[in-house]
């Protein structure tokens, strides 16, 4: 999708470039479906019909009913809506269990709930970035109102067995709400919603624009769910505010586009990931933070020599774009790597490369060549 062959974009876990066909859908929707879907005249009825079609299309990719799918502005809003709503909905206890390497949009709401008297237990990941599901389950009891766990980690790409976690949580306490942040998983790995109550996805990770996301809310929970927002009956009262119909249609188009190519994309991503792993093996200073069984779209490593911001700036001078951590934690050390037990040097020198289907072997080679130059010439950290 990039017109400049000299530009190598390898930060797709932060955001993806909007697909041209998705942009076309949005542009057409802005011109043809301008009416408010909630109004009562003819053009509004057509807008409502288009909104319902978009909702059904996104729901199909998740394997849920259309009425269980609610449009939001992004994955972060979906997480906030689910978590704060869960606390308002379940009043039989104050206990919450969460993994120790969640996105800030999960961390911060739970930190706020802790200040308001909730007992939030944080379970650290193993040193390889995987989560001990059994340890999570040890903390689930009769007063546990919520368990939250991301499906794919946004920094190191590790995948958590949220299906097993959800099933075991429900065996221990059927009233416990299970929330999953699937922002980095959606359209990359299969998602099974059995025993999951709420699940967040985002558009700008799948070549839709920024400003659109969705929340799955199970039929099991919808009648009791108490959303934290007030002010309108849009999205069946869950999320007030006039719906962003063009972007909802764009989200549906982006999801449908990727649904056709999940297997072939996985093969291509694995080849790119392995090419990068093989190239990095030439540098004895490099330690991989992403385990071999992480999703192939993400490879995180520490070069243990040069500050991340120095290396990133050097790469950017050659129009090679990667990151050092989550874009939502800009300027902050990686809490994921810290939770994995990495030392300060490894955290300060970490780099995340993340792929999409538009990336090529040439992108990987350009990165490796420039990275080699940086390792030779940039100022090293004094140990």
Where are these regions (language model features)?
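Pyridoxal 5′-phosphate
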Residues: 1-383
């Amino acid at each position: 999708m990039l017109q400049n062959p000299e530009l190598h974009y390898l930060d797709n876990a932060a955001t993806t470039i909007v697909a041209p066909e998705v942009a076309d859908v949005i542009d057409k929707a802005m011109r043809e479906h301008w009416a408010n879907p909630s109004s009562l005249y003819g053009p509004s009825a057509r807008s409502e019909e288009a909104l319902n079609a978009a909702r059904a299309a996104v729901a199909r990719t998740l394997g849920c009913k259309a009425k269980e799918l609610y449009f939001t502005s992004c994955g972060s809003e979906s997480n906030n809506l689910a978590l704060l709503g869960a606390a308002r909905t379940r009043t039989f206890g104050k206990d919450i269990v969460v993994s120790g390497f969640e996105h800030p949009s999960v961390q911060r709401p739970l930190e706020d709930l802790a200040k308001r008297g909730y007992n939030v237990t944080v379970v650290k990941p193993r040193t390889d970035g995987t989560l001990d599901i059994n340890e999570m389950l040890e903390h689930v009891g009769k007063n546990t109102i919520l368990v939250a766990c991301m499906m794919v980690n946004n920094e190191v790409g590790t995948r958590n067995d949220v299906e097993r976690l959800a099933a075991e949580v429900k065996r221990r306490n059927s009233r416990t709400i299970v929330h999953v942040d699937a922002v980095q998983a959606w359209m990359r790995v299969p998602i099974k919603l059995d025993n999951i109550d709420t699940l967040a996805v985002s558009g700008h990770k799948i070549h839709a624009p920024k400003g659109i996301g969705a929340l799955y809310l199970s039929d099991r929970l919808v009648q009791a769910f108490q959303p934290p927002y007030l002010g309108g009956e849009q999205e069946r009262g869950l999320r007030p505010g006039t719906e962003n119909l063009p972007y909802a249609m764009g989200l549906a188009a982006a999801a449908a586009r990727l649904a056709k190519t999940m297997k072939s994309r996985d093969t291509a991503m694995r080849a790119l990931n392995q090419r990068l792993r093989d190239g990095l093996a030439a540098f004895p200073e490099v330690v991989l933070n992403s385990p071999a069984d992480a999703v192939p779209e993400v490879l995180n490593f520490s070069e243990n020599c040069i500050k991340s911001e120095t290396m990133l700036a050097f790469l950017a001078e050659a129009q090679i774009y990667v990151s050092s951590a989550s874009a939502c934690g800009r300027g902050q050390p990686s809490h994921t790597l810290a939770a994995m037990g990495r030392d300060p040097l490894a955290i300060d020198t970490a780099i995340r490369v993340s792929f999409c289907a538009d990336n090529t072997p040439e992108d990987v080679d350009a990165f490796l060549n420039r990275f080699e130059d940086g390792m030779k010439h940039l100022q090293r950290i004094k140990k």
